[in-house]
From Swiss-Prot:
Optimum pH is 6.5 with oleate as substrate. It catalyses: (R)-10-hydroxyoctadecanoate = (9Z)-octadecenoate + H2O; (9Z)-octadecenoate + H2O = 10-hydroxyoctadecanoate; (9Z)-hexadecenoate + H2O = 10-hydroxyhexadecanoate; (6Z,9Z,12Z)-octadecatrienoate + H2O = (10S)-hydroxy-(6Z,12Z)-octadecadienoate. Homodimer. Optimum temperature is 25 degrees Celsius with oleate as substrate. After 120 minutes, the enzyme activity is nearly unchanged at 25 degrees Celsius, but is reduced to only 25% at 35 degrees Celsius. It comes from Macrococcus caseolyticus (strain JCSC5402). Belongs to the oleate hydratase family. Keywords: Detoxification, FAD, Fatty acid metabolism, Flavoprotein, Lipid metabolism, Lyase. Its EC number is 4.2.1.53. Pfam families: MCRA (PF06100). The keyword Lipid metabolism applies. Its cofactor is FAD. This is Oleate hydratase.
Length: 589
């Protein structure tokens, strides 16, 4: 397996790998990583679909990519997916998956046309004082010290950041900036999270720094992620005769492990209550999605909080069982045990057709929520909320069969141990109606109307004990390599597998690890697209410098006297050169 860039490799079709007709594949879980791996096995590995088996513990595919109408509760979205144009592996996948919405088009075609016709951006990113837009919204408000800390972090080597927290590398200057408000609420970073992952994010998305404040960097699907991404993949794979088995819990994979070789010999499962073992040969490839951020989710309703839990589910127990067999299979406890009580645990879906509530939403987002087009353009964050509450409405309706007069709002609180201004409770203690009341309060609904309007919404809370597990501080070796050294037939896929440079909590990471696993185990002779190399582009770096300093010119940026002298001399030498052109393009001179 090797990395590539450019369209020479992107448009090429690899030859059929030797011996693939004699191979089969077992994929543990039916999340995006597994569905992507199955697709790459068929398209690029040219494996027969009937030789591919997807084993899913639940009765529904999709993993964390959800969006359902629960008959007892109502519409539920545990989260959303922010995408961008340089998710190279994701788009490589979906260019080959037929759209369920547009005839003779791929999912990529559909997505591309949609976001061309209705580009995403926010008209109000942060509010305070019960519905008032933050006066400095749109500015980064980074001090000289904070900017220096960002640069220092990016210049460090990854191995210098083993088990280092964000709070270890950033001071109060940075944590008090608008940049941090945008960053932490958009990505769900918190000060106790991994500085290593923070660095990856900064370097991975530096080309989108200019779109951080207004979300113009982002792209979204038409409907919820289950209907827009998962269902087309499922239908595509079913048409290729891939086998889906639900109600199957994989308890363990027996692996013969040495430093030189790892061979999966059997899969121990419980199928509808019966224990079984699936024997394996080296021709039987196993793809494991280790760990899960939505495992063990509990649900409440309008009148009941979602019950807190810390019980690990099958994906964590499987990873624990694998890690005891081989130290190269990672350290799951690092991610799912002892998450701080302040962490994000709860999100909620509020569904309503109440015109007064919809009007309050429109007052903040400056768009008609029922237009079928972009609404908030990403999350709106309440800066003075103790919960650090945020909410968003993507294009409505979010569900294909949803009534035309209805909207579904996604709400989450970054801090789970703080009491709300309206409810005087933590979000964990709140029923759906109480979460809705807190949201309506911060939107500026008069207090005497809040309770009645909250009753006009059906709000379903979800408690996810491991939702921020990706971000916990880690060191090299805590996550297994996608294909461990010497592995003959076992690979790890998803956001708890280790690959270079890319960032977790993204659809791209799931698809990238799947692609790498398939290409390596089958020896597919085609390059995996490298992570977009924006951090190596001097134009992008100069533009980022301008944005991080809120558009100031070089001669306006606060510098020590000596640095100012050096800057003036360098600018004089750059006059009339290509360097001057670059600085002008970046709005620095």
């Amino acid at each position: 397996m090797y990395y590539s860039n450019g369209n020479y490799e992107a448009f090429a079709r690899p030859k059929k790998p030797e011996g693939v007709d004699n191979k089969s594949a077992y994929l543990v879980g039916s999340g995006l990583a597994s569905l992507a791996a199955a697709s790459f096995l068929i398209r690029d590995g040219q494996m027969k679909g009937e030789n591919i088996h997807i084993l899913e513990e639940l009765d529904l595919p999709g993993g964390s990519l959800d969006g359902i109408l629960n008959p007892e509760r109502g519409y539920i979205m545990r989260g959303g997916r922010e995408m961008e144009n340089h998710f190279e592996c994701l788009w490589d996948l979906f260019r080959s998956v037929p759209s369920l919405e547009v005839e003779d088009a791929s999912v990529l075609d559909e997505f591309y046309w949609l976001n061309k016709e209705d580009p995403n951006y926010s008209k109000c990113r942060v509010i305070e004082n019960r519905g008032q837009r933050l006066e400095s919204d749109g500015k980064m408000t980074l001090t000289k010290k904070a900017n220096k800390e960002i640069i220092q972090l990016c210049l460090m080597k990854e191995e210098q950041l083993n088990d280092v927290k964000i709070s270890d590398v950033f001071s109060k200057d940075f944590l008090d900036s608008n940049f941090w408000i945008y960053w932490k609420t958009m990505f769900a970073f918190e000060p106790w999270h991994s500085a290593m992952e923070m660095r990856r994010y900064l370097m991975r998305f530096i080309h989108h720094i200019g779109g951080l404040a207004d979300f113009s960097a982002l792209k979204f699907t038409k409907f919820n992620q289950f209907e827009s991404l998962v269902m087309p993949l499922i239908e595509h794979l079913k048409a290729k005769n891939v086998t889906f088995e639900y109600g199957v819990t994989v308890k363990n994979i027996q692996v013969e492990c040495s430093k030189e070789s790892k061979v999966a010999k059997a899969i121990d499962i419980v199928r509808r209550g019966n224990e079984e073992s699936i024997p394996l040969t080296e021709n039987d490839l196993v793809f494991v999605t280790n760990g899960s951020i939505t495992e063990s989710t509990t649900y409440g309703d309008n009148d009941t909080p979602a019950p807190p839990t810390s019980k690990p589910g099958g994906a964590w127990q499987l990873w624990e069982n694998l890690s005891t067999q081989c130290e190269e299979f990672g350290n799951p406890a690092k991610f799912y045990k002892d998450l701080p009580e302040k962490s994000w645990f709860v999100s909620a879906t509020a569904t309503t057709n109440n015109k007064e509530v919809i009007d309050y939403i429109q007052k903040i987002c400056k768009r008609d929520p029922l237009s079928g087009r972009t609404v908030t353009g990403g999350i709106v964050t309440v800066d003075d909320s103790n919960w650090q509450l945020s909410f968003t409405l993507n294009r409505q309706q979010q569900f294909k069969n949803q009534p035309d007069d209805q909207v579904s709002v996604w709400i989450y609180a970054l801090y789970s141990d703080e009491r709300g201004e309206r409810t005087n409770k933590t979000i964990v203690e709140c029923s759906g109606k109480e979460i809705c009341e807190e949201w309506l309060y911060h939107m500026g609904v008069p207090e005497e109307k809040i309770s009645a309007l909250a009753a006009e919404c059906n709000t379903i809370p979800s408690y996810m004990p491991y939702i921020t597990a990706y971000f916990m501080p880690r060191k090299e070796g805590d996550r297994p390599l996608v294909v461990p050294h010497g592995s003959k037939n076992i690979a790890f896929i998803g956001n708890f597998a280790e690959t270079e440079r890319d960032t977790v909590f993204t659809t791209e990471y799931s698809v990238r690890t799947a692609m790498e696993a398939v290409y390596k185990l089958l020896e597919v002779d085609r390059g995996v697209p490298e992570v977009f190399a924006s951090v190596y582009d001097v134009r992008i770096l100069l533009h980022a410098l301008s944005v991080l300093n809120d558009g100031k010119k070089l001669d306006e940026i606060d510098m020590p006297f000596y640095e100012r002298l050096v800057e003036k001399r360098l600018l004089k030498k750059a006059s009339g050169t290509f360097i001057e052109e670059l600085l002008e393009e970046a709005n620095l001179i």
